[in-house]
Regions:
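Structural motif
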Residues: 8-12, 52-58, 99-101
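Surface-exposed patches in mature extracellular/periplasmic domains of secreted proteins
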Residues: 33-41, 125-126
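Short, well-ordered secondary-structure micro-motifs within conserved domains or adaptor modules
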Residues: 37-73
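Long, low-hydrophobicity ectodomains and other hydrophilic envelope-associated domains
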Residues: 22-26, 30, 34-37, 61
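A sequence-composition feature that detects small, non-aromatic residues
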Residues: 12, 19-20, 33, 47-50, ...
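Feature activates predominantly on carbohydrate-active enzymes
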Residues: 2-3, 11-22, 26-28, 74-151
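Compositionally biased regions
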Residues: 6, 10, 40-41
Length: 151
């Protein structure tokens, strides 16, 4: 799937907004173009390649996916600061969901995606951001909880 937009709720917490802006910033560095950040209420129902970021309690699209059991319920399946990264087809449209049990988990999920899928290197003296032609994401189904809180 190719990422085309990032969707976060107007009622998102500061950490959820930080997660969305962080992903947007790195996407700009990868491809040299802006990926739009769209309110979950303004995201068109026919938006293919949307990244849905946030908690089920703040993002109605993620809540609907949890209720329809298209993605796991983070409150039941994760420890604090844990995250779920899931690609899926919903109504014929590709979506990438990054959610967590709490806002810190959403941010952890974004950083996991950046490191493990997009190859960003975070080092004491800086970071390494690979250049890409497009933002293609493979099929993913990741659920992770840290062994210790406050990663």
């Amino acid at each position: 799937m190719i990422l085309n937009s990032i969707s976060v709720s107007d009622s998102a917490s500061e950490l959820e907004m930080l997660a969305a802006r962080t992903l947007q910033d790195y996407c700009r560095q990868f491809i040299g173009a802006e990926i739009p950040l769209i309110s979950s209420h303004d995201l068109e129902t026919d938006a293919d390649g949307a990244v849905l970021i946030g908690l089920p309690s703040t993002n109605p699209q993620i809540d609907a996916l949890v209720r329809s059991r298209k993605i796991r319920n983070p409150e039941r399946s994760l420890k604090p600061e844990g995250f779920i990264i899931e690609t899926l087809i919903d109504g014929g449209l590709s979506k990438l969901v990054i959610t967590g049990r709490e806002p810190k988990g959403v941010l952890n999920g974004v950083y996991h995606l950046l490191r493990e899928i997009f190859g960003v290197g975070f080092f004491g003296d800086g970071r390494q951001v690979p250049k890409r032609d497009s933002l293609t994401v493979p099929e993913l189904s990741i659920a992770s909880s840290p062994k210790f809180n406050n990663q």
